[in-house]
């Protein structure tokens, strides 16, 4: 990795003459008093690395020469050179020389162009434009105070994506323009297509004109033929109908007699049916009563079955428990039997071993025969002497054995009692476990029930609140809709207004906090009546844009020009000169200051409002406005409520209609608010409807709570039963057994005391008997070499006693195991009996359930049968009722027939008369039709006769009442009857029409068709003979427009591709930098804070195009909660800013990093952390050159460069260097104290 080795300065700023500064170590600190020239050294490094003059704290390049600022330049040139060193490569020198008013760049003493110079530096990782190698004084605080938008600008500068911003905007404009051109050509093409369609229609109309004339003639013939054909058909039909009616009159008389006979028969049938219906109703009542009696029996049987099923479930549960007990007891007994067999086996093995040992010992202890005889003789003699004592001892032995047996019995009973107590303890433990489980289940169930109840309450409250809120929202929505309806404002923004709104949003986004908005959007008249007056006074300033400064305004104007927007008026608050408000005007009667009737937000736009309103006064009417304006010794600017304005100059202006239109813009603001409220209420209504739909969930929760409550009730009952019955009984029995066990102790102790007392007496008797034996066996004992005869006997019987003792132990073990085995057998038998008993109970309950189910089914079957019978009877009743109704209906019909028989006769006679009249009318109609055809010159196709045979006289006139007139009419009809018309040209469909309505419809259709054709013919003017030429012209024009549209579409596509390409390049540059910084910043912040709990994270406001909006930067200081950056302390802000600086530096890092007083705002703790971090990084990542005034910081450096001033015409900086690597750090780790 390369590093900055030396800096050579000549006549640069405060450095007079030539000075070589260095060498620079990996971590070098520059120190010195204020004003000594430390920052000038940093400026020198910046200068040689190509920094702009404006960032070097001078106005012109010449001002960088020593003494130039005071008018005494030390020379006409100055330069700074830098020696850059890399491992394994030659040192390179970069120099920048001030010659006259320009810079000259050199690499290794060779003059190069600026771009070559920059490229070489970029190869080393030094980016001049991004300034990734230095941090100026105050830059840390500046970064800490940056807002998200300024942070984005910083990233744009670092990533160099900002270089593409101008191209990005240009491509975007080209894309938008190309899309607009495409849309324009599309609409143009659409209009020409409409013209082409119109030309086609003109040609088609000319072709149709002649065809329509021919159609009219054919339609006239068809209509007349249709009328005549159906007239003749109707005449023929009427003749047949007349003959038919005469026959019907004869038949009607015979039908009347038959109807009377039928009526009598129907009356008899109806009487029979009604009697049957009454019988069925009686049977239905009986079955209904029977069913009401059977239902309770079925319900009772069902309840018995349900109850028995529950008992069966409980019995099965008990059976399972007893079976578990039985299996456990059986296992215990098997273990005891195994133990018994083991003891018996051990006893047998012992007996066999003793037998073998006794045989071997018997051979060793055998006396001589004479000695044996002597022993037996002496033994007999001793027995005789101690006979009394032996009898007394025998009596003691008998008593002792009896007491020992009694002691063994008591101890056996004690063991049995202890076993029973253990059994009861097991049962009590089982009861307690069951109680614990039940209590645990009850507790859990209660908690669950409480949760369910709570949930039910919450859901109920939520649903009820939702219902109430829905009603409220609907009322509010209705009110809003009414208000919107009353407003009757249909605002459709023009593209011009939309464009202005877009530009307004853009400059607000570009200059957040500096652009406040349009004046009309920031203020509102206090009352509606003032709207017109305020509108008049504000005038063109209504749409003026308020900004904080003149610079912001000029920047906005430049932006609008670039966007080709319309001219806008800006009111910069720092530039406006406003006269103070005349307080005396507030005392005038009948007038108010216009500024006093306007509400505005934010408060600091008041200056702009004062500028727009001045000292203008608003009055209620024109007279007051004129009086106050011109009536006093001093003129005032006044306005009436109707908008009449009186200027001080005497000019009076109105324009009420135009003002009202402008004033409506105040109302439009209210309408916008109403629309926003409507949208908000609609969204809330959707949310509340979702909550209301939780009713189904509420019902489910209620059902679950009910089920849980029932199970809890049963569990509590079971718990109570277990506590009060099973546990209490077992505790009582255990207490009784413990009482019995307590009585065994005293009895056993009493027996033991008696046995011990008797043993002492027996011991005294034995001692007396021993004295007798010693006297008798004295000589014999000397002979065999023992002290006394007992020693001989004990030696012989000792073995037997040990064997007897061992045998007794085996016997006791067998006795104990036998007792336990007998007890377990008894308990096992009890368990087996209980299992058997529960099996019998289960079997019995199952049999009873089977019987009860059969009984239930039997009752159900009876009910089903009864219900089926009842339903059958009801069906019969309905059928019979229907039959009776039908019969009544039939009788009613017969009565109607009979009652109307005479009327029918009269009716038939009337019909005959009517038919004759119709026949006469049809003949008259035929005559009129033929006469009309002759008069209208409609050529009818005739097969017999000619058009001349048609009479010109009127036929069937109402005035003709004489016999001669009738005869003449009949003669005309007879002559015209000879004319036969050829209906071959008449369509068959028209001939087939039969019904009068159908004939009328067809006739109307033909007439309508004829009328339409005639109407169309009348409307159509003479055909356009140039229609074809026009069509050809329009087709050519359409093709031309289509080509233009296609070309515009391709241009739009190309423009979009170009825009997307530059957008992608800009995004890639920005995102590469952002992702690198965002990835590293948390780790760097942790390292700076020396605490892994510290957190730092970056987030773009616009992830799609992050360079268009701000970047949020947040830190969580160690041991603290999350707080916004503004709420962090000064030191925390500085550490956060340093983390961001180092993270930015990690993206395309420069080999060295020059930092000017970054520790200014840090306390000692944070200084140590930052210094240690820089020291760590300088060893492997970058060379650090830091200007610092704080000892805690620069003592961590590897070398020091001291800058001190010498006074002259201006300050002269001198430099000292000091290598700290020779002096090891006494405390390398600041955390180790």
Swiss-Prot record:
InterPro entries: P-loop_NTPase, RecF/RecN/SMC_N, SMC, Smc1_ABC, SMC_hinge, SMC_hinge_sf. Its main location: nucleus. Residues 953-967 have a biased composition (Low complexity). GO terms for cellular component: cohesin complex; kinetochore; lateral element; meiotic cohesin complex; mitotic cohesin complex; mitotic spindle pole; nuclear matrix; nucleoplasm. GO terms for molecular function: ATP binding; ATP hydrolysis activity; chromatin binding; DNA binding; mediator complex binding; protein heterodimerization activity. GO terms for biological process: cell division; DNA repair; meiotic cell cycle; mitotic spindle assembly; response to DNA damage checkpoint signaling; response to radiation; sister chromatid cohesion; somatic stem cell population maintenance. It comes from the Eukaryota. Residues 104-124, 163-503, 660-935, 991-1068 form a coiled coil. Residues 284-293 have a biased composition (Basic and acidic residues). Residues 515-629 form the SMC hinge domain. It holds the Pfam family SMC_hinge. CDD domains: ABC_SMC1_euk (cd03275). Forms a heterodimer with SMC3 in cohesin complexes. Cohesin complexes are composed of the SMC1 (SMC1A or meiosis-specific SMC1B) and SMC3 heterodimer attached via their SMC hinge domain, RAD21 which link them, and one STAG protein (STAG1, STAG2 or meiosis-specific STAG3), which interacts with RAD21. In germ cell cohesin complexes, SMC1A is mutually exclusive with SMC1B. Found in a complex with CDCA5, SMC3 and RAD21, PDS5A/SCC-112 and PDS5B/APRIN. Interacts with STAG3, NDC80, BRAC1, BRAT1 and RPGR. Found in a complex containing POLE and SMC3. The flexible SMC hinge domain, which separates the large intramolecular coiled coil regions, allows the heterotypic interaction with the corresponding domain of SMC3, forming a V-shaped heterodimer. The two heads of the heterodimer are then connected by different ends of the cleavable RAD21 protein, forming a ring structure. Involved in chromosome cohesion during cell cycle and in DNA repair. Central component of cohesin complex. The cohesin complex is required for the cohesion of sister chromatids after DNA replication. The cohesin complex apparently forms a large proteinaceous ring within which sister chromatids can be trapped. At anaphase, the complex is cleaved and dissociates from chromatin, allowing sister chromatids to segregate. The cohesin complex may also play a role in spindle pole assembly during mitosis. This is Structural maintenance of chromosomes protein 1A.
